[in-house]
Structure formats: C-alpha cells, structure tokens
Amino acid sequence: MAAEEEDEVEWVVESIAGFLRGPDWSIPILDFVEQKCEVFDDEEESKLTYTEIHQEYKELVEKLLESYLKEIGINEDQFQEACTSPLAKTRTSQAILQPVLAAEDFTIFKAMMVQKNIEMQLQAIRIIQERNGVLPDCLTDGADVVSDLEQEEMKILREVLRKSKEEYDQEEERKRKKQSSEAKMEELPVYTSEAEKMSNSQGDGEHFVQPPSEVKVHFANQSVQPLARKMELLPETSSLTQKGLKIPGLEHASMEGPIANLSALGTEELRQREHYLKQKRDKLLSMRKDTRTKQIQNTEQKGKPTREAEEMTEKPEMTAEEKQTLLKRRLLAEKLKEEVINK
C-alpha cells in the first residue's frame, strides 16, 4: 500500500515537473515576468505596485495549474502532497517549482522579478555593445574620468609642493644672510668694549691688556703677538677665574649677539613656517577644487556635438520611452555589478 502511494506521489511530481518545463506553462509565465519586472528594484521597499503585480501573477499561476490538473485528473490534495514530498525538496525540483512557490511567497516573487530585471538589463547592454561595437558614454561607469582627475590633481600637488619648497628655501636663505650681516655688525663694538674694559682692569701685578697701539698679553713669562692677530691665545676664562681675576663684560659676552637669540629665533622660525605652509595648503585646496570643477564640466560638455552627429547619421533617434528604458537598465546593471564585486 505504501509502495503504491509512493509511486503515485512520484508520478504526480514527475507530471507536474514536465508541465512546468513545457511551453504551456513557460511561455505565459515568462511573458508576464518580462513585461512586469521593469518596475522591480532591489533598493526599493515593497510598494503597492509590487503587491498588485504579485496578485496578478498568483491568479495566472492558479489558472494555469488548475487547467492542467483538471486535464490529467490530479486533485488539490494530491498536488499538495506532491509539493511537500521529499522528491520535491531536491535542488533541481526546487528550481523547477520556484515559479509556483513565488505565487504564495511574496519574498520569493520579488527576488525572482528583480533577478529577471537585471538579466534583461544586461542583455540589452550586450545587444547595444554588439551592434555599435562599444558602449555609449551614458553606460560607462566613469572610471577613466575619475582616474584622469586624480592624475591631474597629483600633478598640481607636486607642482605646488615644489614651488612651495623653492619659495621657502629662498626666504630662509634671505633671512640667514640678513642675520649673518647683522651679527657681524654687532661683533665689532663688542670686541672694542671688551678691550677697553680689559685695559682698565688690572690684578695681581700682571698686565693682561695694554694700550691698543701695543696690545700684548703676558702670560707665563711669554710674549704673545698683538691681540688683533692672535685672539685665540688669550687665557681661558676659567684660568682667570681661578686667579681671582674678573674681566668686566667678558663673562656676559657669550650670551650676547646671535647666540643668545637662538631659542627665540627657533620659535619664531617654526611659527613662520607653520603659517607659510598653512597658506600653501589653503592655496592647494582651492586649486584642486577649481581644477576638479573644470574637469567635470569639460568632461560633461566634451563629445556632446560628436555624439549627436553620430547618432543623427548612423542611428535613428531613440524615442523618449526607449531612453527611459535604457536609463533604467543601466541603473540596474550598475547595481548588479556592485553586488557581484561585493560578493
């Protein structure tokens, strides 16, 4: 008894599968899906239009199945049992039964319609490419334009950085020359003041500094050449301190002139450099923004007369409906491309 029931279920499943593969089922179902799938988009939420189309599809499926089951003598209970049997759970059977299941499940129906819409978009694009040999500009993804913009921005960036470095180096060189000349002017009065103070300071019976006309230093019973020519042979400050001798002005000489201004100069230089680089950065951002805007405008305007002339001479003008359909197909093709890449 069980064997007979299994055989009956198997026969019902095979019979239904054969019907779903045949033209009596596939032709009206495919016609309906292809005509109605254009409005389905995976990004859109379920709209009232989707529900209405699903209801029409459900009525069509019920009509076709009812006509076939009545013709071969299969009742509704036998059909339900066949659909829930293990034979209908295989991958092949599920693929065949998908159009039937879509009539009862809106999620399956929507996924089926979106997939068919994408397939038709790709098919339309393929036909256009085969006919024209290349895709029109409206169907390209704009990758080349973006690449050109990026290359142009990099050229501008390198040029601005190069000019900024040259200007900064020139400015720093000018400052160094100015500071060097000022330092030389400051050294002369410092040395003169030190010589005068040393000539007035004597201690322990030793004359370290004599009148400017005969400037000599007596140290360790040795005569040294004039101070103006042999400044490096003067006694070190530490030795003078050990003898209890003080040379007014000499102990503060190391803190005067450009050496004392190093810390202040470093801070000021950093501040100026920061301000200078900020100005260049703002200038760079402005140039990049202007260039990007001009490139986009030129890209949009470029080739419009050429494309219009080619379309007028080589191809018949597209109707508004065809343009709208082509635009929708392009958007869905881009969506499919993104989904394939993300996977």
From Swiss-Prot:
Residues 147-187 form a coiled coil. The modification Phosphoserine is found at residues 85, 147, 201. The keyword Ubl conjugation does not apply. Pfam families: ARL2_Bind_BART. Its main location: nucleus. One of its GO terms (cellular component) is nucleus. The keyword Phosphoprotein applies. This is Cilia- and flagella-associated protein 36. It comes from Mus musculus (Mouse).
